[in-house]
Design a protein with these regions (language model features):
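Beta-sheet entry/capping signal
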Residues: 1, 38, 144-146
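Beta-strand elements within well-structured catalytic alpha/beta cores of enzymes
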Residues: 1-10, 32, 191, 199
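Functionally constrained cores in energy, signaling, and assembly domains
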Residues: 4, 24, 195
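A contiguous, mid-domain pocket- or channel-lining segment that forms the substrate-recognition surface
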Residues: 71-194, 198
Length: 199
């Protein structure tokens, strides 16, 4: 299975209304399409946001209503982090904020090596503060990392930074879906703000 995740893109006027993929010379992909099986597939079930983690999990045949936990568990699996009962795992991005606005979602295309220095530093500094005793940050790849909160409540409303470049970040902080999740949302938001102070 070859997934062109995010390849469809939007038509570009200067390319005659074609997308970049339509405009590109793609002899190898053309051959794969000609010799293979192609078709249309609805990869995002009703009620789920159209993220790659949703679509890819559905394509692999999983019932999302039964198994979907968000990106965190996938991030943990990808780096070999073994989650324990009661752990709440979240994808944690390093991003660039300037003048209170999200400049970019990838911390300026940070390398994994550079990110590892920052994530280790943040983990060491946050561990000194009792309020973050149940928080663990683990390095992933480039700007994508893992946040694990022991006893965290996953019923949260989070905004993906890549969806909101140029917007003020404060109104986009984590919000609870239910009041019981307020302590977890508050903890994550304090961690975000403390991380900015430290970095």
């Amino acid at each position: 299975i070859i997934l062109g995740d995010g390849m469809a893109d939007w038509p570009v006027a200067s390319l005659g209304g074609k997308t970049l993929l339509q405009y590109a010379q793609t002899p190898n992909m053309d051959k794969l399409a000609r010799l293979g099986r192609t078709g249309m597939l609805k990869t995002v079930p009703m009620g789920f946001h159209p993220g790659s983690e949703v679509a890819n999990t559905a394509i692999l045949g999983y019932n999302l209503k039964e198994v979907y936990e968000g990106r965190g568990s996938l991030e943990a699996a990808s780096i070999g982090y073994e989650l324990q009962p009661g752990d709440m795992a979240m994808r944690c991005n390093l991003i660039c904020v300037a003048d209170g606005r999200i400049k970019n979602h990838s911390a300026g295309h940070i390398t994994t090596e550079e990110a590892d220095v920052l994530i280790r530093f943040l983990q060491e500094e946050l561990a000194k503060d009792e309020q973050f005793a149940n928080v663990t940050l683990t390095t992933g790849i480039q700007y994508r990392h893992l946040l694990v909160i022991k006893g965290g409540d996953k019923r949260l409303r989070c905004t993906a930074p890549h969806d909101v470049p140029g917007q003020e970040f404060m109104p986009l902080l984590v919000k609870p879906k239910l009041m019981e999740a307020q302590p977890t949302a508050d903890l994550i938001n304090r961690m975000i703000l403390r991380s900015q102070e430290l970095l």
